[in-house]
Structure formats: structure tokens, C-alpha cells
């Protein structure tokens, strides 16, 4: 299968760059797959999992927390709000972090502190839902 160039970029770093066969992307209007010579496209992403196939045998999976995707003749670029390799995630740790965030919401005496704790909890719930754990 022909390859195309793909880059996954988070605010911290270039997460992945290279020639790939396909990338499955969680678009806000639905999941879509990009192959070589895909029509140009610019879209937003919802929290979800990106599947990157370098070859039939080599698959990379990342959780992304929203962002933008651009398909051009040069390839696919994803600018993600956050990108985490799936193998680095632990379901028990995510559940514990959700519980901690909910306790922080209950304990907060200032609206701003409560809002930040709720935002953290919501991000963790999105992660859990995207991973279906």
C-alpha cells in the first residue's frame, strides 16, 4: 500500500512523524480514515483514539484530547491539544484520578478552583470514554 507523510503534534512536542499507510482520526463529525491521495480537508477533532498504521504489522495508537486535522497534498498533520500513547495509560490510575478530581470539586471553596477541578474531571471522563474502559 502506498505511503504518505503524517505528523502528530502536541503543545509539548512532535509526537510522531513518518511515512504511514493509513491513519484513523476521531473527527467531530465522525471517525474517518486517511489514505494516500485523500482529498484536502480541514476539520476539528473530538477526544478519541488515533490509529496509525505504518505497515500491516506496525500499529501505533494515541489518545488525543481534541485538536485540528489538515489533509493536504503533502500529507496529514494533526495538531492535538494532548496526545498520549495508549500503552502508557492505566485504567485503575484514570479511575483514581477521576475520584480525586470529584473530591477536589466537593472540597473547593472558590469558584475558580471548582471550575478547574471540574475541567480536569471532564477531561479524564473523556479519556475513559474514548478508551471504553
UniProtKB/Swiss-Prot annotation:
SUPFAM superfamilies: Epsilon subunit of F1F0-ATP synthase N-terminal domain. One of its GO terms (cellular component) is proton-transporting ATP synthase complex. InterPro entries: ATP_synth_F1_dsu/esu (IPR001469), ATP_synth_F1_dsu/esu_N (IPR020546), ATPsynth_dsu/esu_N (IPR036771). Coiled coil: none annotated. The keyword Repeat does not apply. Keywords: ATP synthesis, Cell inner membrane, Cell membrane, CF(1), Hydrogen ion transport, Ion transport, Membrane, Transport. One of its GO terms (molecular function) is proton-transporting ATP synthase activity, rotational mechanism. Its main location: membrane. CDD domains: F1-ATPase_delta. NCBIfam families: ATP_synt_epsi, PRK00571.2-4, PRK13449.1. F-type ATPases have 2 components, CF(1) - the catalytic core - and CF(0) - the membrane proton channel. CF(1) has five subunits: alpha(3), beta(3), gamma(1), delta(1), epsilon(1). CF(0) has three main subunits: a, b and c. Belongs to the ATPase epsilon chain family. This is ATP synthase epsilon chain. The lineage of its organism: Bacteria, Pseudomonadati, Pseudomonadota, Alphaproteobacteria, Hyphomicrobiales. The gene is atpC.
Amino acid at each position: 500500500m502506498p505511503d504518505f507523510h503524517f505528523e502528530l503534534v502536541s503543545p509539548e512536542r512532535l509526537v510522531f512523524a513518518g511515512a504511514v499507510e493509513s491513519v484513523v482520526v476521531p473527527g467531530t463529525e465522525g471517525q474517518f480514515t486517511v489514505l494516500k491521495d485523500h482529498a484536502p480537508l480541514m476539520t476539528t477533532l473530538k477526544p478519541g483514539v488515533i490509529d496509525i498504521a505504518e505497515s500491516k504489522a506496525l500499529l501505533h495508537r494515541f489518545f488525543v484530547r481534541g485538536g485540528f486535522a489538515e489533509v493536504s497534498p503533502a500529507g496529514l498533520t494533526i495538531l492535538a491539544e494532548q496526545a498520549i500513547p495508549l500503552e502508557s495509560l492505566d485504567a485503575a490510575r484514570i479511575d483514581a484520578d477521576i475520584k480525586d478530581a470529584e473530591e477536589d470539586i466537593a472540597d473547593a471553596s472558590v469558584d475558580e478552583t471548582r471550575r478547574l477541578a471540574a475541567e480536569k474531571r471532564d477531561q479524564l471522563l473523556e479519556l475513559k470514554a474514548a478508551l471504553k474502559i
